[in-house]
C-alpha cells in the first residue's frame, strides 16, 4: 500500500516486538500543538492505534491516556481514538453507548443544527490483536484462580480460557494494560493468585515484574480491532500528510427509528449497523390502557424501549451529504450525520508499531 497525501478532514510464540511511539512531540517552545485522547494506560491497543494515527501528521501531537472509554469523550482534546468493533467479539458497547448518549441530549427527538455541530469521525484503521496471559513473577499456571482484562479481550479469548482455566473467575477491567498493571499492586490475597490478558507491548513494558505464560490467546489468528478517529470542531484540526485515501469510504449516521433505515437500503449498501438502548426517558404507558394494544401487542414499542441505531454505509464520493442526495434532507430531520472514514493509516505505519 503506497503513501499519498490527502486533503480530507492458541499459544504460538512471536518474535516481533511492538514499538510504541512516544507520548507526543513538542513544538519549538516545548509545548504540543494538539492532543489525542486514547484508552490508557501506556501499553494498550488504544495507544498503538493512537500512535498510528499520530504518525499521519507532521505537527506535534501529544497522546493523552484516559482511564476509561467514557473519559476519552470527556477530554477537550483535538482528537479522540475509540475502539469500534472486533472480528471475534463484535461491537464495543462502551464506545457505542458513549457516542450515542453524547449525541442525544435527552430532549426532543430532533436536534437543532447547533447541537449537530459536534465531533466527527474522520478516519479508521484495523489493528492486528494478539493477547498474552501475564502473571506476577513466580506465579504458576496451577495457581491462577481468576483472570482480569477488558471485556473484549476476555470474550476474544473465551475458548482459550475454557480450555486452560475452566474454573477461573473472570473479572472485567477498563483496559487490557490497566489489568496487567493491577496485578503488580493487587493485595487481594483472599481470592488467590490471578492473571491478566494484555498486549505484547504491555507485557514488554512491565517485563521486570510480570511473566508471560501464554501468547496468542485469542480465538483466531486473524483477529483485528477497528479503531475510529474523531476530530473536535472547536479546535484547529491539522491535515494528515502521510495517510491514504480510503478505497471504500464510509459515512456514519445515528437514527432514532428502525423505519429510518429503509432509505439507506434503497440508496446505498449498509456496511455495518448496531442498535443500543437510547439514553432517553421512555414514555410511560398504562397497563390498563387497552387502546394502545393491538392483538395483545403494544403498538408503541419504541416508547417503552427507545433505541438508537448506529449505521455505517458505503458512499460513492458524494455521499448522503451531497446536495443532490435524496436522503440528505431526511438524514437532517430524523438522524445525525457523525462523520466519514475518508482516509486510513498505511500498512507500513501499522507494521511499524
Where are these regions (language model features)?
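Domain-level signature for soluble enzymes in the chorismate/prephenate branch of the shikimate pathway
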Residues: 2-353
Amino acid at each position: 500500500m503506497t503513501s499519498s497525501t490527502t486533503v480530507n478532514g492458541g499459544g504460538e510464540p512471536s518474535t516481533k516486538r511492538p514499538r510504541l511511539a512516544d507520548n507526543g512531540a513538542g513544538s519549538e517552545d516545548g509545548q504540543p500543538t494538539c492532543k489525542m485522547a486514547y484508552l490508557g494506560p501506556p501499553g494498550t491497543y488504544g495507544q498503538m492505534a493512537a500512535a498510528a494515527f499520530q504518525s499521519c501528521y507532521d505537527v506535534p501531537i501529544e497522546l493523552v491516556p484516559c482511564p476509561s472509554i467514557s473519559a476519552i469523550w470527556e477530554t477537550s482534546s483535538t482528537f479522540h481514538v475509540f475502539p469500534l468493533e472486533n472480528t471475534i467479539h463484535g461491537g464495543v458497547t462502551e464506545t457505542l453507548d458513549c457516542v450515542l448518549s453524547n449525541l442525544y441530549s435527552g430532549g426532543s427527538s430532533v436536534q437543532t443544527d447547533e447541537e449537530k455541530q459536534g465531533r466527527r469521525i474522520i478516519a479508521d484503521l484495523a489493528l492486528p490483536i494478539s493477547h498474552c496471559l501475564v502473571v506476577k513473577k513466580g506465579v504458576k499456571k496451577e495457581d491462577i484462580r481468576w483472570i482480569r482484562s477488558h471485556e473484549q479481550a476476555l470474550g476474544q479469548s473465551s475458548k482459550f480460557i475454557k480450555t486452560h482455566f475452566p474454573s477461573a473467575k473472570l473479572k472485567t477491567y477498563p483496559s487490557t494494560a490497566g489489568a496487567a498493571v493491577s496485578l503488580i499492586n493487587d493485595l487481594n490475597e483472599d481470592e488467590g493468585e490471578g492473571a491478566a490478558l494484555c498486549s505484547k507491548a504491555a507485557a514488554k513494558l512491565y517485563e521486570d515484574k510480570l511473566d508471560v505464560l501464554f501468547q496468542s490467546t485469542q480465538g483466531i489468528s486473524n483477529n483485528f480491532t477497528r479503531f475510529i478517529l474523531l476530530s473536535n470542531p472547536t479546535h484547529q484540526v491539522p491535515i494528515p500528510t502521510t495517510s491514504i485515501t480510503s478505497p471504500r469510504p464510509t459515512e456514519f449516521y445515528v437514527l432514532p427509528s428502525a423505519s429510518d433505515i429503509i432509505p439507506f437500503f434503497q440508496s446505498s449498501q449498509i456496511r455495518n449497523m448496531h442498535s443500543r438502548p437510547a439514553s432517553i426517558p421512555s414514555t410511560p404507558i398504562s397497563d390498563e390502557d387497552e387502546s394502545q394494544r393491538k392483538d395483545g401487542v403494544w403498538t408503541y414499542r419504541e416508547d417503552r424501549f427507545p433505541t438508537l441505531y448506529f449505521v455505517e454505509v458505503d458512499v460513492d464520493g458524494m455521499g448522503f451529504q451531497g446536495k443532490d442526495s435524496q436522503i440528505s434532507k431526511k438524514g437532517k430531520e430524523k438522524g445525525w450525520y457523525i462523520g466519514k472514514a475518508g482516509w486510513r493509516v498505511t500498512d507500513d505505519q501499522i507494521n511499524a508499531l
